[in-house]
Amino acid sequence: MITRIAILLILMAVVPDLYIDRRFLRRIKGRRAMLRRLLWWLPTLGMIAYTMVFVFDRQFAPSDIKILNVYLFLVGLLITPKCLFALCSAIGWGVKKMIRRKANYGNIVGVVMVVLNWYVLFYGSFVGFDQITVREMTYESAELPEAFDGYRIVQFSDAHVGTYIGGREHLLSAVVDTINAQSPDMVVFAGDLQNREPQEIRPFVDVLGGIKAKDGVFSVIGNHDYSDYIEATPDIKAENEKETRELERKMGWRLLVNEHEVVRRGTDSIVIAGLDNDGDGKKFPQRGDVRKALEGVSDSAFVVMAEHDPTCWRRKILPESRAQLTLSGHTHAMQFMIGNWSPASFVYKEWGGLFSEGTRALIVSTGIGGFIPFRFGVPGEIVVITMRRLKVEN
C-alpha cells in the first residue's frame, strides 16, 4: 500500500522542509541556529526511515495494522501540514512579488490550513470513526408483492473487523445492537468483512452471530474477503478464503455466491440474490455471474440483488437481469465528506445513497468501518430500507 506511493511520500516530506529551511530557518542567527534546524529536520528524517520500512515489506499492509495506522496518523500530523503551509506560502510569495507588497499573506493562509488539517485529522481519528448513524430510505415499486408492502431490510457493509481489534471491539457490539433495534425482516451485509485474512474475524464470531432478523442475515463477498492483500501462495489464499466463508456461515449468515434464495409471505415471495465480487477486473476481482445467480428465477419475480461493488450495477446487473433493487457498498465515500460532497465522486458515479434507472434502483452504503480508522463527515452507516408497493391507478 505505502510502497506504491513511497517516492511521493518522501518528496512530500522533503520538499516542504527544503522550502521552509530556505525561507525561514536560515534566517535564524545565533549559536543554536544549526541545532534548531537539525531539530526541525529530525521528524522528516524519521518519517523517511518509517516509509522505508514499508518499502522493504512485500505485504500490501503489515500484519500488525497498528504499524500502518500510526504511520498514516503521523503523515497527517507532520507531512501534510507542512505541504499545505509550504504551498500557500510559496503562492503568497509569488503574489507578493507580482503586486510588489511587503507582506506574504500566504503564510497566514498556510497557518489556517495547518490548523484545519489538524482538526480534520483528530476529529476523524478520535471522534468520526466511532460514530454510527441510522439512515432511513424508502423504495417503492409496483412490482413488489402485496404481502411485502412495508418489508424492512437493514443493509450494512464494509465492516473491516480487523480494525476494531485492540480497543475498539465495543464499537462492533454497538453496530449489532443498533441493527437489532430496527427489528428488521431481513439483514443484508454487502461485503468486506475483513481487512486481510480470516483470523481477524474469529474474535467477533459470537458478536456478529448476534444479528437477528425474521428472515435471516444474508451476505456477499467483498474484494478484501479474498485474502488478496497478503503475500502468500495460491493454496494459502484459497484456504483463507474458504475459512472466511465458513466463519460467515458459522455466524448463522447465509452467504450468497452467485446464488439466490426465496423468501415467502403466504403465497407471495421475493428473491434475495447475491453475486461474487464484481469489480473492474484489474484492481478488484471480477467474478460475478448474474445468470448463475438467477438460474431458475422467473422473469416476473421481484429480485433484491446484493453485490459489493456498485460499478457492477450498470456493467452487469442492469443489462443482464431484471433485479429491481440492488444493494452495494465498497466506496466508503472515501471516509471523507463535506456536506454532500465526497472525493469518491471523482471515482464512482454511484458512491453513496439511492440511485434510480427507470423503476430500478441501487442503494450504496458508505459502510460502518474501514481499513484505516478514520472518518470525517461520513459516520458508520446502517441503512434501513422500507419497501413499499406502489399502487398504479388504471
Kindly give the residue locations of the regions a language model identified.
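Beta-strand secondary-structure signal
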Residues: L87, E136-T138, V384
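Soluble catalytic domains of enzymes that build or remodel membrane lipids, polysaccharides, and related
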Residues: A147-E393
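Non-catalytic terminal accessory segments
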Residues: M1-D130, V392
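Short N-terminal secondary-structure initiator segments
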Residues: M1-I10, M98-A103, D130-R135, A159-L172, ...
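Short, charge-rich amphipathic segments
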Residues: Y19-I28, I99-L116, T138-P145, L172-V187, ...
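Hydrophobic alpha-helical transmembrane segments in integral membrane proteins
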Residues: N117-L144, T163-G167
